[in-house]
Amino acid sequence: MCTGCVQKQYPDRGNTCLENGSYLMNFVGCANCHQRDFVLISDRTMVNEDEEEIVTYLHMCKNCEHVIARHEYTFTVVDDYQEYTMLCMLCGKAEDSISVLPDDPRQTAPLF
């Protein structure tokens, strides 16, 4: 993918995992046509296999269709937790885990 189009490669996004969209704060402009315009999403695929959902797509320049980055988002349920991951040169890297139970056992305080 194109390192000249992004301010920072794979910025740490904490637990912000995007299934769609673009992180435009990290987009400095197209290295090919030198325009800073909207970023298109192209070739979006969604695959469901063995309790895992994988979404991939390309970020492309609106003006010249230059490929800026490849975006990958995954969702899976492991034990009692929904696990999310994102990896993209433009949008960054992130992971999140959310309990499917009403009260997250990791958030409860010990009684003693």
UniProtKB/Swiss-Prot annotation:
The keyword Cytoplasm does not apply. Induction: Up-regulated by FGF signaling in embryos at mid-gastrulation. It holds the Pfam family Churchill. Zn(2+) 1 binds at C2, C5, C30, H66. Zn(2+) 3 binds at H59, H71, C88, C91. GO terms for biological process: cell migration involved in gastrulation; fibroblast growth factor receptor signaling pathway; fibroblast growth factor receptor signaling pathway involved in somitogenesis; negative regulation of cell migration; negative regulation of fibroblast growth factor receptor signaling pathway; positive regulation of DNA-templated transcription; regulation of cell migration; regulation of mesodermal cell fate specification. Keywords: Activator, Developmental protein, Metal-binding, Transcription, Transcription regulation, Zinc. Gene3D superfamilies: Transcription activator, Churchill. The keyword DNA damage does not apply. GO terms for molecular function: zinc ion binding. Zn(2+) 2 binds at C30, C33, C61, C64. InterPro entries: Churchill_sf (IPR038543), Transcrpt_activator_Churchill (IPR009508). Transcriptional activator that mediates FGF signaling during neural development. Plays a role in the regulation of cell movement. Does not bind DNA by itself. Belongs to the Churchill family. This is Protein Churchill. It comes from Danio rerio (Zebrafish). The lineage of its organism: Eukaryota, Metazoa, Chordata, Craniata, Vertebrata.
